[in-house]
Amino acid sequence: MDAREEKPAGGIGPAAGIPAVVSGSGNGIARNAIVDMLDTLRADHLGCYGNDWIETPAMDALAGESILFTRAYPESLPTMPGRRSLHTGLRTWPFRVWTPNRGDLALPGWQHIPEEQVTVHEAMAGAGLHTVFITDTYHFFKPSQNFHRGFRQWRWVRGHESDPYGSISQVRAEDVDELLPEGLSQEEVFWMWLLLTQHLANQGERESEEDYQAPRVFREAMRLLEENQGVERFFLMVDSFDPHEPWDPPEKYVEKYDPGYEGRELIQPHYGPSDYLSAAELRHMRALYAGEVTMVDRWLGLFLERARELGMLEDTLLIVTSDHGHQLGEHGLIGKLSSGLWYELMDVPLLVRRPDGVGAGTRVEAFAQLHDIPATVMKALGVEPPAPQDGMDLLELAAGGVAPREHVSAGYANNSWCRDERYVYFAGNDGTGPHLYEMEADPLQEHDLAAEERGVVEEMHEKLLADAGGPLPV
């Protein structure tokens, strides 16, 4: 039997529909909640996390009003496995119960939410809140997915990446070719050619910054706020696929970070070793990503400004985070490769703003993960979880009311990752290809100790096995 079949899907709850009304009297610290998910946002690309060359004034200002978690990590990677833990508060890793769906990515954990698992939005709806969802993350709406379950109002902003929205018959092959790197074979770039063809078909009619994906998402989110001013209580989830690639922000953002570049506009990375890029091309690709980050920051800021104007932040818990980062050549890789679980992929921002201002401007070093967010939201809004949660209340963690974790674990495809107070470790699920770093002495994870510290490697792998409840699937 495949190890992936050994363990039933986690969670307890009704098999269908929104759960019965549970405690939702508002006895928590907030009446409403907004969760902003910004896909592929590296923590180290924000000023509030120490970056000194990328402009992120909105998130930096928000950090001054929020509790900032300095050691926040995904529970599962990439997009949809991470969303499952975010939407349910239950662990998705180690991906034991998984069947690939036709027409979707064949990655462990990339699947719909099991019927027996209750989402945070179902719990909120069952407690009488108006639940609202806005996103351009097109994976949510593939035929096999069901993540909009429990939202009473939702909107899909079309056109990001490979969303089959625009007609590819309108795209010229030579326009696609100009976006492809030189020196790679046709077989190597074929998937990029398909993706970029659809991208150009989707984005061909942009005329101003407002027509780009993140601006469209946040403009629509503003309209949703305006439409729902009269509701008694609400839960809003804004899921922006930006700053996910392709990276082609308006030119003014690119000029901030790489003025005068004259080479090819390589807006889509080829996943794998980064040495196919020249030094100038790699620098420019990093500038493209930085430009996307600054654009997303601007529109998040405009959205929050509108929420303030409408008085809809006054009694609202606000959380901003990301699902994972992106490799940009730091360890010789570019993309989101599951074999490279270094800081550039694993460190994510996590800002939690209480409406009463408690903890504003503080930094919390306790480990936090994305599946902590549902427990945090439900506790803050006085909604009883419909089932036991795997995550913990981040506000209680920040206040010292609960013991911090001694370590955290996560997984991506057939690789798993663990961090404790001293070390970070990752390897294949079968223990092959181990990497080990001592974080205080080596925060950039440049000096691999796995070969010389075999005892520590074994200890860290045992922590993974304990968290997984047994052998890891291979």
Language model segments and positions:
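Catalytic domains that recognize anionic headgroups
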Residues: M1-V474
